[in-house]
Amino acid sequence: MRKSDRSRLQQLWFALAGTLICASGALAQQSPPQRPQPIVAWSAKPVETTAWTAPNKPHWKLADVLTKHSGQRSWQEDIVSDRDFIARYISMAPGEKSKRQFFADDRVFWIVQSGRMRVSIDGQQPFVATQGFMVQVPYRVAYSIETEGSEPSLRFEVRGAQAVPLYPIDETPVPMDGKKYMKVTYTGHGAYDEVNKPYLDFIKDVVNANGRGGPFVKDDKTFANMIRGPGQPAPPASNLGHFHIGYSEFWLVLEGKIDYLIEGVPFFTAEPGDVVYAPQGRWHRASFGGNGMATRLAINPRPDGMHNFQAPED
């Protein structure tokens, strides 16, 4: 290569490198993408606020549930029952084991409140879940739970409102009122993906890692989303939050303190293990309370559900 050609080639490389450096610097200085601008519209809020129907109520305190079942080792307490979900606290005595079962078209998930449980899910290695573990099983995938150790295991479990347990052919079904178990054939089953994992160790993977939260369950009809942040002063009472149309929402407090303002209910604070329920159409506002970090698991049937916020005054 002639000297003049080599010189021109070096100049070209220097020019190209300078262009790349300038471009990367410009990209670094660009601001993050902005949120979409709110759209002002007419929404249909119920004239009469939707009532709570048992077992649903504004605030279930875990302490009250435990007091009610004091001295019992194996028990269940229904906490939520509506069009979309059934959620309950379930305590299993040491050594107690569930039958292998699955659900036809719904995921089931639970959060371990205390104790140790051995979880066996078809297609996965068995694992032991302890306090703070969040576990989910896709539809038509059989699983079982067994309490380990000398203490009961306690979990908060959520399943579809119309979901009933089905059983592998080598299992004996538990009789159910109004149902007759019979042999059938079926095909296919659900699967895990980038969002939906067999389990999450909330204490290890989120709290100790100072994680940000995010969805744990997300499909076409179930959304369980961890919302995490530092404690802050409560917003003014004039901040009503938002409401939903056609579906209700509930939260399990995972960490810290969560402040709530729900239409028709005085301001209150919920603590770990507590469950809060807002019927469809009611204004509700959740905020991080206390001095440390706080996390709530928001549960509803609409991953991209509409949030009806207050419109600016004219």
What are these regions (language model features)?
Residues 13-24:
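Bacterial N-terminal signal peptides
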Residues 91, 103-119, 228, 243-259:
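Short, conserved beta-strand element in jelly-roll/cupin
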Residues 99-100, 119-120, 137, 143-149, ...:
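Short beta-strand His + acidic residue motifs that chelate non-heme Fe in jelly-roll/DSBH
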